[in-house]
Each structure stands twice: as structure tokens, then as C-alpha cells.
Amino acid sequence: MKTLIVYFSLEGNTDYVAKRIAENVGADTKRLISKKIYKSKGFAKFLSGGRSAIKEETPELESGDIDLTSYDCVILGFPVWASNVAPPLRTFVKEHQIELQAKSLAAFACQGGSGAEKALAKLKGTIGIEAFAAEGIFIEPMRQQSEDTDAAIDAFCEEVKGV
């Protein structure tokens, strides 16, 4: 099964998990780059990113077109912003909704607090599916590296391999 991980990462947590998963399951990766610049520090980060997420913005991407035809499974990864999917991933999902519905899908969310469950539910709704084949929630995985985090990533990978 050929797998692609499509993800957005602002501070590196989602990038860290995506690369760990890619190594474990032998997946290709595609990091989404937004043309909109998001603040990465302080209160402005939460204000601008949260507002953008709540308003369900779909910023233009610099990442170029992503061809999903050769992939059987797509894993979507994102940071949680105000209990929502980060806007750049929302853009990708809306642009590829029909293609994604025909794939085996998994998703993971990285968060500093809470809201990942709601964000994953909203992502399923945006795609138009009932469930992901695998779901993972990771709390600041890059900053809080531990055996528990490693075990959670490994468990997610095992679920993906079972798809």
C-alpha cells in the first residue's frame, strides 16, 4: 500500500510526528506551505491563527498541486487551532475532497491544550466521511519527547499498517 502524509506544521510538532510516521510506515510526505504568514510566537499567534481557524479560512497554498492518484492511503496531519483544523490543511482538503473520499484515510492532530477531538470530527465532516481508519492525538510531541509519546506514535503507525 502506497501512503502519503499531507500535513501543515507551524512550530514543528506536526512536522516531527509526520517524519516519525513516514519512517515507520514507509510513507512519502508533503508539507503544506501557506502563502498567508501566521505568527508563531506570543499572543498574536493565538489571536490570528485562532481567528483564521474559527472563520474556516482557506488560505492559498505555495505547495503546488499534489497528485494523489498513485496513493492508496493518505494521512492528514495538523496542529489544532481553537479546536479547529489549521486553515492550510482545510484548503488542501477542500481542493481534494472527492479524491480523498476514495482513499483510505488516517489523521493525526498535535495540540498544546485541548480540542483535537473536535478538530478531527470537523475534518471528517469537511471531507464527508464517517470515520478515519486511524486517528492520533499528540500533545506537544516535539517539546515533550518521551517514551509515552513514542509509544503513541508507534501505536498510530500500527493502526495505519493495518489499513
Model-derived segments and spans:
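Redox-cofactor binding/interface segments in oxidoreductases and associated redox assembly factors
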Residues: 76-77, 107
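Short, glycine-/small-residue-rich phosphate/pyrophosphate-handling segment
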Residues: 106-141
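Conserved donor sugar-nucleotide recognition element shared by glycan-biosynthetic enzymes
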Residues: 85, 116-120, 149
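Short flexible/disordered coil segments
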Residues: 89-104, 134-146
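Glycine-rich phosphate/pyrophosphate-binding loop and the adjoining helix
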Residues: 132-163
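N-terminal beta1-alpha1-beta2 submodule of the flavodoxin-like/Rossmannoid cofactor-binding fold
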Residues: 1-76, 83-85, 90-95, 101, ...
